Amino acid sequence: MKRILITRPRAQAEAFAETLRLAGFEPVFFPVIEIQPIESNVALERAVSKLGCYDWVVFTSVNAVDIVFENYASAFLQEVPALKFAAIGPKTAEALQARGIAPDFVPDEYIAESILPGLGDLRGKWVLLPRAEIARKALPEAIFEAGGIPHEIAVYKTLPAQLDLEGLAALQSGVDVITLTSSSTVHNLVIVAKRNGLDPLSLPGDPLFVCIGPITEQAAREEGLVNLVTAKEYTTQGMIEVIRKMEVS
């Protein structure tokens, strides 16, 4: 049975792991990052109090949805004339729907830049972007170039996770596949490997790295990782399909 290393936060990995089990694989938890909400977020509080000033709210991750709605669900569920919601990726859209918000736009391609055409004419319009403290600038820059006014607000931090000894032991003994679901998982996996005497470019078992999308793949290549494949659909289900096909071949 092939062993699949899951590097995303444990709380977000359970459903992924269960799907892997049902597909006949052995999931191994090795979270290399954790998500920490930004506390006493004055900037977010101010933005929420003035939701009527915005034309769009764009959620780029489930993390952002969870954290924003944890404290401000009632404000977002109030009817705000002209305010529209966009979500990047089906899981982000599902997270919004679970909280009573039907996204007005979800792009077919699950990367930030792909959302721009669906936002329409942005000239003079305000776009609220609740996101990670460290995030790619492609989306706000594209909004600005289109004449819009992007308002980025950091709502969470991505931090290195506490070392999981069982996961480390699996990595040291060799796994078949390592799943990478964000640039942060790439960078922190490399750091953890080096700190524990492993060469990330030559890991035991010569594992296949499966990336969730092109941005993650780019981060992996920049770290020098090889033996990479990327899901055609930028979701964990898409990653599982890649793993299945590789097993057959």
Language-model segments: what does each one mean?
Residues 1-249:
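Signature of uroporphyrinogen-III synthase
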